Regions:
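Alpha-helical repeat scaffolds
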Residues: 224-235, 263-277
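Residue at a conserved register position within TPR or TPR-like alpha-solenoid repeats
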Residues: 217, 256-259
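A conserved acidic beta->alpha catalytic loop
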Residues: 35-47, 63-66, 91-94
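Catalytic-site signature of metal-activated, phosphate-bearing donor transferases
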Residues: 69-77, 96-225
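Short beta-strand-to-loop acidic/aromatic patch adjacent to the donor-nucleotide binding site
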Residues: 83-97
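Short, well-formed alpha-helical segments that are part of the catalytic scaffolds
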Residues: 9-29
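Cell-envelope/extracellular polymer assembly enzymes that use nucleotide-activated donors
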Residues: 5-7
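Active-site nucleotide-sugar/metal-binding loop of Leloir-type enzymes
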Residues: 74-86
Length: 278
């Protein structure tokens, strides 16, 4: 690409079934950078075989204890050669549409100060196939290599590293990220909830992780933990115009006035929280 070298990078563990396909779709990029975090299913051996035939394939195996997604992602990003300008970070079960590079080139030519590109994701095993605006946030996985880092131990996301200048994120409806999720793969809700609880104990003001924990309590109908967690979210979240904030406000008001099972302590906590932010 005339706007600089490119690299697709991601982490994996025991995902041997996806390696060949991911490498095929990532072939147009200058580099393919894969971090194996402890596979035991033959993934690492297969990667070594491919790397022996592909000078643009950079691989490493490293385990992390304790596990944090952002730490692994940061390490993976650091593996990307320093001369790379644009990075793409599709998971191993995700593939960018074949028009991605040419579309990026046109977009960057038209908007030279762009720092990241968001796109729609197609979840082919989901009832809601297209993930993108206006109903959902688009996927932000295309970014300048030198200007972003990974943040949050779970449900990690890219974060702008500069304080003296602003990022410029551009949405492109011509690029698609296809999510070919393994419907047979066992989900890991217990691990995720454990990590969210640990983060909440260490850093109760981290509203990014707290939101997912609140949502888990809500779905589980666990009022005992939901109410104090939701109240803390409203207390610490600075964006009072967000949908998350407004939805929690409405739900706590409804609980306060209509939920018959609330005890006096729960009602008092809700009232104090609502009074403090109105």
């Amino acid at each position: 690409m005339k706007h600089g070298l490119t690299a697709a990078y991601t982490i994996l563990k025991n995902e041997i079934k996806y390696i060949e396909k991911w490498l095929y779709y990532a072939k147009p990029f200058t580099y393919r950078v894969l971090l194996d975090t402890g596979s035991t299913d033959g993934s690492w051996e297969l990667l070594q075989e491919y790397a022996s035939k592909d000078a643009g394939l950079i691989i490493e195996q490293k385990t992390f204890d304790p596990w944090r997604f952002d730490v692994a992602r940061k390490y993976n990003l650091a593996m990307v050669p320093k001369n790379v300008v644009w990075c793409l970070s599709p998971d191993l079960d995700e593939y960018y549409s074949i028009n991605t590079l040419e579309t990026m080139e046109k977009l960057i030519t038209d908007i030279p100060d762009v720092t990241s590109i968001t796109s729609d994701r197609l979840d082919i095993y989901s009832r809601t196939v297209r993930v993108g605006p206006p109903n959902f946030m688009p996927t932000n996985k295309i970014h300048l290599r030198a200007d972003y880092t990974w943040s949050q131990p779970i449900y990690e996301h890219l974060a702008w590293i500069h304080k003296d200048r602003y990022e410029k994120e551009v949405y492109c409806d011509e690029i698609y990220l296809v999510h070919d999720q393994d419907f047979k793969k066992q989900e890991r809700p217990e691990l995720y909830i454990k990590m969210l609880r640990e983060e909440y104990q260490k850093n109760p003001t981290n509203t990014w992780c707290l939101w997912f924990l609140v949502y888990h309590f809500y779905k589980s109908e666990n009022l005992e933990e939901y109410i104090p967690a939701a109240c803390n979210y409203l207390k610490f979240d600075k964006n009072r115009n967000s949908n998350n904030y407004k939805d929690l406000m409405k739900d706590l008001i409804m609980l306060y006035h209509h939920e018959q099972t609330l005890n006096q302590q729960q009602k008092l906590l809700i009232k104090q929280t609502l009074d403090s932010i109105q």
